[in-house]
């Protein structure tokens, strides 16, 4: 089929275009970290660390179809980017074999999408912290309480949205039940912020 061949050739095998898209998205992510409007470098660094660790752990469990990746659960829940899990359609095969089989031509797009947008989601989740029962972004917090040495020190002590949640059968739950109301109230803002930033990273 010439149409399919053309699509594969022009998209899946166009590595120059794929790498351009990757670096465009990476640039957008770094600009966000520099400006600090939605997250800063500390949030981005923590988000990157989590994504690498989760991907490594996912690789170790590649042969275990029952393993659930917290990173991919978050990306699926908030509908941010593509996940490696979404590429594993044939559950009777090794997960990495599924990725290669199902997305051999589009793999570089899917991997870059996962790698950058996963970081964006993590960074946003780290930027929101539970301040007296309400999740506030760093900017919201300092606008409300002022930027002093005390408020800076206090900010470091608050627990992030990322550290406050877990996924149980695809549902978002607070690790501490008393935080469930705050999590439910903040999840739409957190999710929409990450989704919009991820979309803008596509250029």
Task: Specify the residue positions occupied by each region the protein language model found.
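Hydrophobic, often aromatic-rich secondary-structure segments at membrane interfaces
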Residues: 1-203
């Amino acid at each position: 089929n010439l149409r399919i061949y053309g699509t594969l050739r022009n998209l899946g095998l166009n590595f120059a275009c794929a790498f351009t898209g990757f670096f465009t998205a990476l640039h957008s992510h770094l600009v966000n970290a520099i400006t600090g409007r939605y997250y800063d470098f500390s949030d981005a660094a923590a988000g990157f660390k989590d994504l690498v660790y989760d991907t490594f752990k996912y690789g170790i469990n590649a042969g275990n179809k029952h393993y659930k990746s917290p990173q991919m659960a978050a990306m699926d829940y908030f509908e941010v980017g593509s996940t490696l899990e979404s590429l594993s359609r044939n559950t009777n095969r090794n997960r990495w074999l599924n990725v290669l089989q199902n997305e051999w031509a589009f793999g570089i797009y899917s991997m870059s999408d996962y790698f950058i947008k996963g970081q964006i989601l993590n960074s946003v989740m780290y930027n929101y912290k539970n301040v007296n029962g309400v999740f506030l972004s760093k900017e919201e917090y300092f606008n409300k309480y002022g930027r002093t040495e005390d408020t800076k020190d206090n900010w470091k002590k608050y627990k992030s949205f990322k550290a406050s949640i877990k996924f149980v059968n695809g549902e978002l739950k607070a690790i501490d039940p008393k935080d469930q109301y705050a999590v439910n109230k903040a999840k739409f803002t957190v999710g929409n912020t990450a989704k919009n930033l991820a979309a803008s990273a596509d250029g």
